[in-house]
Amino acid sequence: MNIHEYQAKEILRKYGVPTSTGLVVTKTEKINETIDKLNTEVYVVKAQIHAGGRGKAGGVKVVKSKEEAKKVAHDMFGINLVTHQTGPQGQKVNRLYIESGCDILKEYYFSIVFDRSASCITFIASTEGGIDIEAVAEKTPDKIIKFSVDPATGLQDFHMRGIAYELGFKDNQAKQMKEIVKSVYNAFIETDATQIEINPLIVNSDGNLLALDAKITFDDNGLFRHPNITAMRDHDEEDPLETRAANAGLSYVKMDGNIGCMVNGAGLAMATMDIIKLYGASPANFLDVGGGADRERVKEALKIILSDKEVQGILVNIFGGIMRCDIIAEGIIAAAKDIGIKVPLVVRLAGTNVEKGEEILSNSGLAIIPAHDLADAANKIVEAIR
């Protein structure tokens, strides 16, 4: 789960991370009133969307008067902001965060993430923070600093000293950086986050370190332990089909292809998407119905897939372990009769009650294309949509 910048800063401040402060606006009619509450020489108007690249896309504006701030805010509120992370459709700006500006002497990059390949927590930092951090990582990777933390031992003093040293901080600034490292680590662990990113982390004119922007991503599996964080969820920022799927107990991620996939198990789903690509097409989604799906969940899964107007065909690939193939077959037939599946449908079943499932499908009278293995299934669905 992602949250907005202003929410991320609120959490970080609770853990002792110094951040820039401001006021959030969620209604157009509140813009002028909110800006009037700020007494500053420089105003920073920031679009609040769950995507990076706002600065380059015009979603962050710095102005020097209340009148300018009000005009910029009114112009920005409600627009579709297109960044390199939103895709061409953009993301509607339903919230603004208006801050007091500050002098910036130097920008840094600082984050903490799960390094799945190394099975540890990793700090990533750079002396080259700001809007071009992606270019820095690509063109000058030597400027990216990494420190790994063993989960068994946790954060140690040498991690904090090392990060401060590598970033070039000395004396009081080194002390501040060590405290920020510790605070961010504690926030990461205690909130079940998967990423906390501060970009930029700045040194202001007073020589103090300040988080000027912040992003936090949480592990969905840990949200039940954090109702206060769950309450921060902004459904307007999420794909409506993904939200609908989550409410039905399905793992769904929309993609850019034209072949809908319904699979049980994340690994099998990934393999299914890979083989679709191998045969010359592209998957329209990742959809894992899980090991304990019933007839209604299968039916809802197919409805969600067909809600995507880009879908030209569907591949169902089920390995029946806990899941029974006859249940899948009944769900497919129920969905087909309820909503009408007008695109080619290829079904590959294997495992528990596979013979019964195949019999149910063959006797249904529906135009379902059976497949004997994964390669056969991929070949048939790709050929069917051509």
Curated annotation (Swiss-Prot):
Annotated ATP binding sites: K46, G53, R54, G55, E99, C102, E107
GO biological process, one term: tricarboxylic acid cycle
PROSITE patterns linked to this entry: ATP_GRASP (PS50975), SUCCINYL_COA_LIG_3 (PS01217)
Keyword field contains Magnesium: yes
Cofactor: how and how many bound: Binds 1 Mg(2+) ion per subunit.
UniProt subunit comment: Heterotetramer of two alpha and two beta subunits.
Purpose of the protein: Succinyl-CoA synthetase functions in the citric acid cycle (TCA), coupling the hydrolysis of succinyl-CoA to the synthesis of either ATP or GTP and thus represents the only step of substrate-level phosphorylation in the TCA. The beta subunit provides nucleotide specificity of the enzyme and binds the substrate succinate, while the binding sites for coenzyme A and phosphate are found in the alpha subunit.
Domain ATP-grasp span(s) in chain numbering: 9-244
Paired cysteines (S-S): none
Source species, domain of life: Bacteria
Binding site for Mg(2+): N199, D213
Residue positions binding substrate: N264, G321, I322, M323
Record EC number: 6.2.1.5
The gene coding this protein: sucC
UniProt keywords, alphabetically: ATP-binding, Ligase, Magnesium, Metal-binding, Nucleotide-binding, Tricarboxylic acid cycle
Protein name as it appears in the record: Succinate--CoA ligase [ADP-forming] subunit beta
Family listed: Belongs to the succinate/malate CoA ligase beta subunit family.
GO molecular function: ATP binding; magnesium ion binding; succinate-CoA ligase (ADP-forming) activity; succinate-CoA ligase (GDP-forming) activity
Annotated catalysed reactions: succinate + ATP + CoA = succinyl-CoA + ADP + phosphate; GTP + succinate + CoA = succinyl-CoA + GDP + phosphate
Pathway(s) of this molecule: Carbohydrate metabolism; tricarboxylic acid cycle; succinate from succinyl-CoA (ligase route): step 1/1
Cofactor (UniProt): Mg(2+)
GO cellular component: cytosol; succinate-CoA ligase complex
